[in-house]
Amino acid sequence: MSDNENLEQLMAIHTEQLFRIAYYYTKDLQLAEDIVQDVFIKFYHQKHYEERGEMKAYLARMTINKCKDYLKSWTYRKITFQHKFFTKQKSVLHDTLILQDEQDLLDEAILRLPIKPREAIVYYYLEEMTIKEIAELLEIPEGTVKSRLRKGKELLKVDLQNIEWEVLFHG
C-alpha cells in the first residue's frame, strides 16, 4: 500500500473525530477543517513516526496542540477582538426569537465553557472516552479530569437553568 493510500485510509477513519475536537476548541467550522487538514499534512511529512500507542490518540494530541497553538496566536486574538467589537453593534438589532432545538442549545452552552472544562465535557460525554483515556490524552492526572468535568457540569447547569426543555413535556 502506498503512502497516499495509507493517508487516505487514515483520513477516512479519523477525520470526523479530529474535526469535532478542532471545532470544540476553535468554535469555527472553516478553521476546524483547516486545522485537521494541517494535522494530516504534518503527519504525512513526518518521516519518523514511531507507533507507541493508539493512532487515534496520537492524531488527537496533534489536533489539540495545533488548536492550542492557534488560540495563542496573534491572528486569533485579532479576529476575536474584531468579532466581539462588530457583533456587539449588530446584536442590539438581532432578535433572539429564532427557535433552536435542545441539542443546539446544549452545543452552544458547551462552546461557551472555558477551554479546560469544555475539553473534559466533550471527550467524556460526546466522544465517550473514559476518565483514564482523557487523562492520558491531555497528560493530566485523573483527579484533574474529574474536577474539570465537575466544573463543566456546574457551569452548564447555571447556563441552562432557565431553559424550558421541550423533551420534558413529551413523555
Label for each model-derived stretch:
Residues 1-8, 78-81, 136-139, 153-171:
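C-terminal edge and immediately downstream basic/flexible tail or linker adjoining helix-turn-helix-like DNA-binding
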Residues 1-20, 24, 33, 112:
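A short, charge-rich alpha-helical start-of-domain segment used by transcription regulators
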Residues 15, 19, 40, 114, ...:
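C-terminal flanking helix
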Residues 20, 34-41, 45, 53-65:
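Structural recognition of an alpha-helix C-terminal capping motif at a helix-to-coil junction
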Residues 64-81, 151:
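Arg/Lys-rich amphipathic alpha helix in sigma70-family domain 2
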Residues 77-106, 111, 130, 169-170:
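Internal acidic/polar
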Residues 120-124:
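A short pre-motif secondary-structure segment
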